[in-house]
Amino acid sequence: IVLAAERQIIELVMTITRKIISDELEERPEIILGVVREALGRVRDQDHLNIHVSLDDYERILQSRNELQSIVGSEKSFTITADTVLERGGCLIETSFGTVEAGIDTQLESIRKAFQEMLP
């Protein structure tokens, strides 16, 4: 019974966290820029990147193109794509070696899995 309650508590906490973050993304859409910056930091050594963001985040990221260029380096190229599948806060970066998922939902799912792995 205790284990079942712990699992339910984890799911409840994750649901509440998703709601709070969703509301925060609505109020502060610039948050996505931090998500993209962090993701780019993980794939800096690639010659070309394709950054996928949601339709809601596309304009914000497009406006930050110069800043993103300074992160990847002036000799590197990248494209920014509005992805209809991604939700606000979502980010995928395609490289020649594969795809990096770095959106808010991906990060929250990793946290949820880590909590569940701690349970017996």
Label the predicted regions.
Residues I1-P120:
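Elongated, mostly alpha-helical coiled-coil "stalk/stator" tethers of large membrane protein machines
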